[in-house]
Amino acid sequence: MDEYEAQLLVVEQALENATDEHQRQELLALKENLQELLSLTRGGTEDDAATDDDSQNADNLDNELERLKSELNDMEATGASKSNENEVQQLADLRTKYSSMVGEKCSAPHEHSWGAISYHNALICGVDDEVIINGDGALDARLRVLFTNPTHREMLPCSYYLEGECRFDEARCRYSHGALVTGSSIRKYNPPDFHKLSRSCPVLAQLPDRLWHRGRVLCVNFVEQVCRVRLDGQDHKERERDFKFEELFPLTTDQEDELTSEDSSSVNDGSSDEEESDMDDLEAARRARMVELSLFTFKPTEKLGAWEEYTRGIGSKLMEKMGYIHGTGLGSDGRGIVTPVSAQILPKGRSLDACMELREAANGDKDYFSVERKLQRAQRRQKKANEKAYVRESQRTDVFSFLNSSVLGSDNKQQAEPEAKKAKANDLQQHSTKTLNVETVRIADDIRRKQRDIAKVQQSLDRNTGDVQLQKRLQAQMHNQKQELATLQAQERSLSKEQQTRKSKNKMFEF
């Protein structure tokens, strides 16, 4: 009975979807038969003959139902094949349409990293092979576009890719190889209208980094087609610049609101903690950029604030608290001066033209009148004068030095050796026992090294007996080596004597 009810529901659904009149008549007849069969089954009071007839009718109904199902399946297969043919034809039409659009300008969407979507002028450069289903459930294709007014680095087209010489693929290249957008999202191209340029008009201006930055118009010269713009933000050293008309793109009210919403969503999206973390990231990025900039900056010989060596250095401490990084230039962007401003003193009674001539005569030296350079020259002159005075005083002889060198010279020579030995003995007595032990080990190593050198020289003498000149040089070298060895052995004996004396004294003081 449940099976008959399910079959009745299937027939009713088929009636709702059927469009052919003949098919509807057959389904209505089948529905009436099923309803009659259900009523007979629920009754349960008929005789066996009626029951047999009903069962026969039920079999007939089952056969008709199976035939109907097969017909429905055939109809669905035919419809599916027709729909596939329609989809193929629709896709071919789409590709033909989009292929004809290659090379045209349009307005394409761009999704930023923070989720905001904005439209920018772009150039269609190709059609993607992949087929997609758009938001309406229809077939669509994707177009590859290059933005003509990129405002962010991920939108900037790769110049090598445009020339066909980029060595990186789309995932590894830092620049854009074209953004993929759906064909249904393409809008009409917005050409720039330079007649709208006026004071305080919002514009996009192209800087040397090939990015387009927002700004406000200060004044316009339509004759020379030049416009002065004040750039937004604090990342530009020269906020007010002159741009030609081809380097500008006037913004409408809707475009300005869209760009403003982008910036506000990128900065104000999230909670206050996220804002603080974003500010920290911006500060860290700023400091990293300044440090990177300092690596490519000319390093002077004198660092900024070197004079604080003689002071407490309060100036550098205050600058560090205000965010200054040592080694970078002055200013918030680190692009200011690195070398300190040197004081200059011009000659007295000379005009500026005469001073310029003097500087040009010195090959345009900027530090020609520098105070620091004059002080350095004066210090060098004083140093040379002191050296000459010392040499002159050392060569100067008087009566007393003459008497000491000539009359008393022999006595001094006789007393020189014992006085030197006495001084050396007194010198050894002033050192500690540990120092004497270290010196003894060092002298012993030197003696062994000197003995090895003497043995090598002796081998050379034995090997070169026929060469007279070489024999003389080797013998002189042998003589010098033996003298040095004798000196080292004498030092070793002196150290041993001093150590033995100290040991004897220690034994005498023991009770």
Curated annotation (Swiss-Prot):
| One MF annotation (Gene Ontology) recorded for this entry | zinc ion binding
List the biased-composition ranges (Acidic residues).
271-281
The record's annotation in Pfam families points to: G-patch (PF01585)
Query: For this UniProt entry, what's an example GO CC term?
Result: nucleus
Which residues lie in Polar residues bias regions?
478-493
Sequence ranges assigned to domain G-patch in this UniProt record: 311-357
Q: What is its main location?
A: nucleus
Query: Looking at the record's lineage, which domain of life comes first?
Result: Eukaryota
Q: Which keywords, in A-to-Z order, does the entry hold? A: DNA-binding, Metal-binding, Nucleus, Repressor, Transcription, Transcription regulation, Zinc, Zinc-finger
Query: Where does it live in the cell?
Result: Nucleus
Please note every region of biased composition (Basic and acidic residues): 414-425, 494-511
Zn-finger (C3H1-type) intervals are 157-180
By its UniProt entry, which PROSITE patterns does this protein fall under? Answer: G_PATCH, ZF_C3H1
**Region annotation (Disordered) ranges:** 254-281, 409-433, 478-511
Biological role:
Transcription repressor.
Q: What is this protein called?
A: Zinc finger CCCH-type with G patch domain-containing protein
Q: Which organism is it from?
A: Drosophila ananassae (Fruit fly)
